[in-house]
Amino acid sequence: MKNIKLIEVPSEVGAGTRGASLGIDAIKIAALDFMSNFFVHFPSEKIETENKLLFEPIHSPYAKRINGVLNMYEKVSKAVKDTIKNNFFPVVISGDHSNAGGTIAGIKLAKPNSKLGVIWMDAHADLHTPYTTPSGNMHGMPMAAAIAEDNVESKVHELDDKTAALWDQLKQFGKIYPKVLPEDVVFISLRDYEKEEKFLIEKYDMKVITTGELRRKGPENVVRSVLRYLSDCTDIYISFDVDCLDSSISKGTGTPVSNGLKEREAEDLVSKFMQNRKVCCFEITEVNPTLDKENLMAEIAFNILQRSVNVLMMN
């Protein structure tokens, strides 16, 4: 049985649509509606955000609020590192997916010699960089930062010196980089990405499992093949963006995409992954109740969260 600690990160400085900072409270409301004591059952820590930057002018159009994201890396990584060092299992509930870069940094700071595998359950690859981004939103870049990639081969923008320096700081955060090797990343239900991201996926032959492949093979076989693929890794981090779910049930997120996972498919996948003892951290992210109807997205997220943690408790 693992000791669980919840890390709440209500930060949305990396998102393009407002409201993801309210996702954690929406999940807590869902827990109350289900009459669950989940959120009083485990120790928790709430991370102070940089959301005040949302009211200030944007200085880097190709890396919006990157200074705030860098500060969040500092705060999130410290919380994750300390949690692991104290022999707790960090369950991170975050606003937008840029926070995952801080989570990855925290794992590596706690376990600098680990070979970290990442299971990225997301409709998007999040492999953009300030040089390639179509939006400038930092939640589209955490995976590129983790593998310390600029992707200058696909460059669309010229960066000012300050933005370039901040991006370098983000990639090199904690003085460990790359934090993850591209071949140790598995994308699940990836289905919405740009040619610049496709270039990196093909360059590094990164593993992608589509929704169709999952349905053909079934969750059991997919989990087995993913864990076999990551067998050289000493630790595994699972990052669950709710937009990996089909848009019919993921209205309450900033970037819903059709042809995604059904709730049961996602639950089965995550809970089966969680049975593996190499899994050292789980994150769920991008719930945005301002876009939702009757808190459905948060209810689904809570069900996945609760089932995953139940598996950890039994391990």
Regions found by a protein language model. Give the residues of each.
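Conserved alpha-helical scaffold segments that buttress catalytic/binding sites
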Residues: 2-315
